[in-house]
């Protein structure tokens, strides 16, 4: 174990930590309660990293907020997360959904339909079958029972078109970027509609197969280079080069 240099409000660069690294964090730095799970508090200012991650900062209301971006790990559901799931089993009144996690989730027919459901008079398989893809939100999560999904919100429900790809769930933050900078750039450069689930699944709806292929290449490049700096601009240049190579553009204005 070795100790990283002290982190202060003036720190602007990302810092890579691995399990066991000791990090000095000023008390005036705000730490997200959900991300404090990744850091073991040794004393008032000293934390021990429990994972491989990037430590980064963002300014919110004149305060410095610490962001912990895991680089390894599986998806653990959190209430409010948007996830992209695949139906893997059907019961009389619910679907069992694989959300790319150690936990299978449940989507109740009454929630999906927005009304009461009677399995004696209605066939649940009319609505969703094994293999169907669903965008849902984690409504509740109890580790002893697993997460419950809801689709009662705008943009949620069965996916009827597009392509589905997967990345490591802990790389999702890099695909989205600060204030959605990376995601907005991907959408602008590829003209694809891109939906990123917190569980590492992504749905692409693109104008043509070539732009879809470029978008997939770019996302996979982000995944493999998530630990590096200057990534957004590098990915933008990569997409432009790929479009030129395929004759989609001659030059970039």
Swiss-Prot record:
Gene3D superfamilies: K Homology domain, type 1 (3.30.1370.10), Nucleic acid-binding proteins (2.40.50.140)
Domain S1 motif: 80-153
Top-level taxon in the UniProt lineage: Archaea
Keywords carried by this UniProt record: Cytoplasm, Exosome, RNA-binding
Pfam families reported in the protein's UniProt record: KH_6, RRP4_S1
GO biological process: CUT catabolic process; exonucleolytic trimming to generate mature 3'-end of 5.8S rRNA from tricistronic rRNA transcript (SSU-rRNA, 5.8S rRNA, LSU-rRNA); poly(A)-dependent snoRNA 3'-end processing; RNA catabolic process; U4 snRNA 3'-end processing
NCBIfam families reported for this sequence: PRK04163.1-1
HAMAP family: Exosome_Rrp4
Family recorded in the similarity comment: Belongs to the RRP4 family.
Subunit relationships: Component of the archaeal exosome complex. Forms a trimer of Rrp4 and/or Csl4 subunits. The trimer associates with a hexameric ring-like arrangement composed of 3 Rrp41-Rrp42 heterodimers.
Name of the protein in question: Exosome complex component Rrp4
Gene source species: Ignisphaera aggregans (strain DSM 17230 / JCM 13409 / AQ1.S1)
């Amino acid at each position: 174990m070795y100790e990283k240099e002290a982190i202060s409000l003036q720190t602007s660069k990302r810092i890579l930590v691995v399990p066991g690294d000791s990090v000095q964090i000023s008390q005036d730095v705000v730490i997200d309660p959900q991300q404090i799970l990744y850091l073991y508090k040794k004393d008032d200012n000293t934390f021990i990293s429990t994972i491989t991650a990037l430590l980064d900062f963002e300014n919110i209301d004149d305060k410095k907020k610490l962001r912990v971006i895991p680089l390894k790990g599986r998806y653990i559901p959190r209430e409010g997360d948007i996830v992209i799931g695949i139906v893997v089993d059907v019961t009389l009144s619910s679907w069992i959904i694989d959300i790319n996690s150690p936990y299978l989730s449940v989507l109740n027919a009454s929630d999906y339909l927005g009304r009461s459901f009677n399995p004696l008079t209605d066939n649940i398989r009319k609505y969703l079958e094994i293999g169907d893809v669903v965008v849902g939100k984690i409504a509740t999560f109890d580790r002893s029972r697993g997460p419950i999904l809801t689709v009662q919100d705008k943009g949620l429900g069965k996916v009827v078109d597009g392509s589905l790809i997967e990345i490591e769930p802990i790389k999702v933050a890099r695909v989205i970027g600060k204030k959605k900078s990376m995601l907005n750039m991907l959408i602008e450069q590829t003209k694809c509609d891109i939906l990123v689930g917190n569980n590492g699944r992504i749905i692409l709806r693109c104008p043509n197969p070539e732009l879809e292929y470029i978008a997939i290449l770019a996302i996979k490049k982000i995944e493999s280079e998530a630990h590096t700096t200057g990534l957004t601009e590098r990915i933008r240049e990569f997409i432009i080069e790929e479009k030129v190579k395929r004759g989609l553009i001659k030059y970039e204005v």
